Amino acid sequence: MTNTKGKRRGTRYMFSRPYRKHGVVPLATYMRIYKKGDIVDIKGMGTVQKGMPHKCYHGKTGRVYNVTQHAVGIVVNKQVKGKILAKRINVRIEHIKHSKSRDSFLKRVKENDQKKKEAKEKGTWVQLKRQPAPPREAHFVRTNGKEPELLEPIPYEFMA
């Protein structure tokens, strides 16, 4: 038997609700405010069929470019064969949530501003760039009175 070509083909688990989360959608979902330029994550909610994104956008992150009463317009990158296209989709707000991908960056910006301000008051220079983790410090290994054992590979012997 061939595969069907429906819009929701292969979404048995993708659009299903988590355990003990079936039924009415919490009101907090509708209370969230979305503005132009917000970064949002797309995640289809099976309880609401209206305004549901296509399965190919599930789990993607996009930027809000338009806001209406019940839905938002989102720009999402989608790979089509060899190229990546910026697709504009309209999705109801039940199927999106604010992304946490920028939180760490914004937190770092805030910390850097604070460091700059303190350095300016003191008249010193401060390192703002993130540094890779340095090599670990040298340390001694305790042997507890035992001599270290020298390990050597067994010499290769050809057996015919």
From Swiss-Prot:
One of its GO terms (molecular function) is structural constituent of ribosome. Residues 112-145 are annotated as: Disordered. Keywords: Cytoplasm, Endoplasmic reticulum, Ribonucleoprotein, Ribosomal protein. It comes from the Eukaryota. PROSITE patterns: RIBOSOMAL_L21E (PS01171). It is found in: Cytoplasm, Cytosol; Cytoplasm; Endoplasmic reticulum. GO terms for cellular component: cytosol; endoplasmic reticulum; ribonucleoprotein complex; ribosome. GO terms for biological process: translation. Its main location: cytoplasm. Transmembrane segments: none annotated. InterPro entries: Ribosomal_eL21, Ribosomal_eL21_CS, Ribosomal_eL21_sf, Translation_prot_SH3-like_sf. Residues 112-123, 136-145 have a biased composition (Basic and acidic residues). Belongs to the eukaryotic ribosomal protein eL21 family. Component of the large ribosomal subunit. The ribosome is a large ribonucleoprotein complex responsible for the synthesis of proteins in the cell. Component of the large ribosomal subunit. This is Large ribosomal subunit protein eL21. It comes from Chinchilla lanigera (Long-tailed chinchilla).
